[in-house]
């Protein structure tokens, strides 16, 4: 796409957020914490040290892991579209306001979501919603986040 050469590396699922204690302390003190941005380098423990790995952590799965570890009830994944769509870019395109985790799994099996784009967002949302009863994930546009939180837009993913 005119961006030159890119190195292909593994993208493992995050196993833990090493800084979770500090993040939790900040959250509990009322601070707004921005964490788990895209392109993070995963680390591995080697004795008392951490060593970087030749890999990159997916921001959606890292955010899901963080939300689970913080015992959050809601996970909001911000993206470039207002809602998740099936048949994206086709004449029968359909924007979804909500879907159960079972419906999401069915759409994923039908290859409705693009790998490296909407697919990891939906996968992370499903993982979060199924991790504990009562959890809901929201996927929406950054500029519509407030309306999404208020239930006016976005796609809600929940376990039925």
Model-identified regions with their sequence ranges:
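C-terminal catalytic "cap/lid" subdomain
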Residues: 1-160
């Amino acid at each position: 796409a005119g961006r030159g050469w890119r190195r292909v590396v593994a993208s493992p699922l995050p196993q833990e957020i090493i800084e979770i204690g500090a993040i939790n302390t900040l959250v509990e003190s009322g601070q707004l914490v921005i964490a788990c941005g895209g392109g993070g380098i995963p680390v591995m423990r080697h004795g008392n040290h951490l060593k970087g790995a030749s890999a990159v952590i997916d921001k959606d799965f890292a955010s899901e892991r963080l939300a689970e570890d913080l015992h959050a009830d809601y996970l909001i994944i911000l993206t470039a579209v207002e809602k998740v769509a099936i048949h994206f870019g086709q004449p029968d395109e359909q924007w979804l306001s909500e879907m159960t985790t079972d419906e999401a799994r069915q759409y994923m099996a039908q290859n409705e979501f693009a790998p490296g784009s909407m697919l990891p967002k939906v996968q992370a949302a499903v993982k979060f919603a199924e991790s504990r009863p009562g959890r809901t994930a929201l996927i929406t546009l950054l500029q519509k986040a407030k309306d999404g939180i208020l239930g006016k837009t976005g796609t809600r993913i929940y376990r039925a």
